[in-house]
C-alpha cells in the first residue's frame, strides 16, 4: 500500500512538473517587461506610450527607474538602469552589473506580487558587424546572447564564461517587422579590441552590446522567456571610431526604437510564446 502511494505521489509530482514547464508555452502574453539601459534610449518610447513613473517599484537604495502602463491589452513595465552615483559621474549605468541587478529585482518583485512577467524584451542600441550584413539603423532581434570578454581558460569554466543563452524564438515577429535575426555578443567595453575579436567571431555575433547577456541570465533565473530588440548605431568592424559613430546615430536609433517597440508589443500581446 505504501509503495503504491509512493508511486502515485511520484507520478503526481512528475505531472505537475510537466504542466509547469508547459505553462509558458501555452499561456497568452499580457504582462511584458522591457529592459532598456540608457535614459536616451527609453525616453521616446516611454513618452510615446504615456507610461508613468513608479517611484516605489525599486528599493530606494538603487538607482533604477520603472515606468508602467498599458498598451492595448498588455501591461507594460519599462525599467532603466538610472544614473551613476557610486562614482559621482552622473552618466547612465551601462554594462552588465546594473543590467543584471535591475532585471533580477524587477522579475523578483513581480513574481512575489503574483504578477509574474510573461515575457522580457531587452531593447536598446548596439554595434553591428558589416561581415554579417549589419547597417546603421537596422533592427535586429536576437536569436541568442553570449559574452566575448569573460575569458576563463579553465576547461570547466569556458562555457560558463561564454555564457551562451538562446533567446525565445521570434521568427514570425522578425518577418512582421522586416527585422534581421542574429546573435548579440556582450562585453563591458564600448570600443572594439583585437583581443575580443576572435571571441566575437566564435560567438557568431551579428551585433554587440553591453547588457544583453546579463539581462538574459537574470531572466533565466526566473524562467521568463526573453529576447532582444537592437538598433544598430555603429559598425564594429568599420572604419569610424565607435564612440563617434555611436553618439552621431544615438538620436536616430532611439527614434527607431520608439517606432519599432509599439509594433513589437502589438504583435506579441495576446499571443502564445510559440506563436512569436
Which sequence ranges carry the predicted segments?
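Cleavable N-terminal signal peptides of Sec/SRP-targeted secreted and luminal proteins
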Residues: 8-24
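Short linear motifs in intrinsically disordered
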Residues: 23-26, 52-60
Amino acid at each position: 500500500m505504501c509503495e503504491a502511494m509512493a508511486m502515485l505521489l511520484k507520478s503526481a509530482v512528475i505531472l505537475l512538473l510537466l504542466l509547469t514547464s508547459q505553462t509558458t508555452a501555452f499561456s497568452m502574453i499580457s504582462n511584458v517587461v522591457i529592459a532598456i539601459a540608457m535614459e536616451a534610449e527609453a525616453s521616446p518610447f516611454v513618452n510615446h506610450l504615456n507610461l508613468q513613473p513608479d517611484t516605489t517599484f525599486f528599493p530606494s537604495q538603487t538607482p533604477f527607474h520603472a515606468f508602467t502602463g498599458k498598451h492595448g491589452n498588455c501591461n507594460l513595465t519599462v525599467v532603466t538602469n538610472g544614473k551613476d552615483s557610486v562614482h559621482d559621474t552622473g552618466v547612465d549605468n551601462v554594462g552588465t552589473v546594473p543590467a543584471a541587478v535591475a532585471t533580477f529585482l524587477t522579475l523578483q518583485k513581480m513574481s512575489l506580487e503574483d504578477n509574474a512577467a510573461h515575457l522580457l524584451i531587452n531593447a536598446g542600441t548596439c554595434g553591428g558587424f558589416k561581415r554579417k550584413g549589419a547597417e546603421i539603423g537596422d533592427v535586429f532581434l536576437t536569436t541568442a546572447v553570449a559574452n566575448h570578454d569573460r575569458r576563463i581558460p579553465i576547461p570547466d569554466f569556458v562555457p560558463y564564461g561564454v555564457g551562451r543563452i538562446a533567446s525565445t524564438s521570434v521568427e514570425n515577429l522578425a518577418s512582421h517587422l522586416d527585422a534581421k535575426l542574429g546573435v548579440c555578443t556582450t562585453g563591458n567595453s564600448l570600443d572594439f579590441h583585437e583581443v575580443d575579436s576572435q571571441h566575437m567571431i566564435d560567438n557568431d555575433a551579428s551585433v554587440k552590446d553591453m547588457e544583453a547577456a546579463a539581462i538574459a541570465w537574470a531572466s533565466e533565473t526566473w524562467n521568463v522567456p526573453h529576447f532582444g530588440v537592437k538598433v544598430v548605431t555603429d559598425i564594429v568592424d568599420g572604419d569610424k571610431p565607435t564612440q563617434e559613430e555611436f553618439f552621431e546615430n544615438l538620436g536616430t536609433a532611439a527614434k527607431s526604437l520608439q517606432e519599432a517597440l509599439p509594433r513589437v508589443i502589438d504583435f506579441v500581446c495576446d499571443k502564445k510564446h510559440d506563436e512569436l
